[in-house]
């Protein structure tokens, strides 16, 4: 544990680095100790120590910028009015050649303190896979309510992607354990919802609730497609999650379609 009253010059660089490695920028900031650490490092004029100080300052700046970005997303949701419960809903899987379309609805506590913001939420496609996995669990743990809905490839073929998209939006919202006063949907108004609904273009980059829904839906569907990859190994589902990559199309042409392919999406390929 670093003692800020200790003479830093009595420590080797390796000792300093080891101690700092144990620290969290987030905890330092929340405990108001980041300034103490930077001032302590500044007392040492060794170049490697000063470089370490600069790195910590950059990490702190990145963290504060992220807090600011996510605060703006929470404020965006609150800007619609004094609704008690706001749900964000998003889908994943409109475009793939195989597998279902999945939607998730999420109600967040939009009045949390800064320390309880869910940082790094964004359009799920902009978040790296390992981070999405981590965030999905955090969102499910912290959400006041969330619900996932699925429409199969067969239903997509029978009734069309627009019907399936609306169905999963509607089902995920109507199945929430808390009835929302407002639903923010990504890109589309939801037909027959019976709850006040506003669509937000590129909502997963603007709205905290929609971004959270985007991540949970993406992680759920990706896991599902990776399970399907074990049953249908010829299409590279573990990597393309059903989208029409060259390997996927190559598999289709060589082995034909599987039970989870969308026939209506394959008319120009087979």
Swiss-Prot record:
Binding-site residues for a divalent metal cation, renumbered to this chain: 90-91, 186
Location, primary (coarse class): cytoplasm
Cofactors that this protein relies on: Mn(2+); Mg(2+)
Recorded GO CC terms: cytoplasm; ribonuclease H2 complex
Its EC number(s): 3.1.26.4
A Pfam family per the record: RNase_HII
Compartments in which it is found: Cytoplasm
Name of this protein: Ribonuclease HII
InterPro entries reported in the protein's UniProt record: RNase_HII, RNase_HII/HIII, RNase_HII/HIII_dom, RNaseH-like_sf, RNaseH_sf
UniProt GO BP: DNA replication, removal of RNA primer; mismatch repair
Alphabetical list of PANTHER family matching this protein: RIBONUCLEASE H2 SUBUNIT A, RIBONUCLEASE HII
Family: Belongs to the RNase HII family.
Entry annotated with the keyword Oxidoreductase: no
Domain RNase H type-2: 84-270
């Amino acid at each position: 544990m670093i003692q800020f009253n200790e003479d830093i010059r009595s420590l080797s660089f390796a000792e300093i680095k080891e101690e700092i490695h144990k620290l969290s920028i987030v905890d330092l900031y929340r405990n108001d100790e980041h300034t103490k650490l930077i001032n302590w490092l500044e007392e040492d004029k060794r170049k490697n120590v000063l470089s370490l100080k600069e790195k910590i300052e950059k990490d702190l700046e990145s963290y504060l910028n992220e807090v600011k970005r996510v605060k703006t997303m929470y404020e965006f949701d609150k800007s619609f009015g004094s609704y008690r419960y706001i749900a964000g809903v998003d889908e994943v899987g409109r475009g793939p050649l195989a597998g279902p379309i999945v939607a998730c609805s999420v109600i967040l506590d939009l009045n949390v303190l800064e320390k309880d913001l869910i940082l790094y939420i964004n359009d799920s496609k902009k978040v790296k896979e390992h981070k999405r996995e981590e965030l999905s669990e955090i969102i499910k743990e912290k959400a006041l309510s969330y619900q996932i809905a699925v429409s199969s490839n067969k239903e997509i073929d029978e009734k069309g992607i627009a019907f399936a998209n609306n169905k999963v939006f509607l089902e995920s919202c109507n199945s929430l354990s808390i009835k929302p006063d407002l639903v923010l949907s990504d890109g589309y108004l939801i037909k027959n919802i019976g709850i006040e609904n506003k669509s937000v273009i590129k909502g997963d980059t603007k709205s905290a609730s929609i971004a959270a829904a985007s991540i949970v839906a993406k992680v759920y569907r990706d896991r599902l497609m990776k399970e399907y990859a074990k049953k249908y190994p010829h299409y590279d589902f573990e990597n393309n999650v059903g989208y029409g990559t060259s390997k996927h199309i190559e598999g289709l042409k060589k082995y034909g379609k599987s039970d989870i392919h969308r026939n209506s999406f394959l008319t120009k390929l087979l």
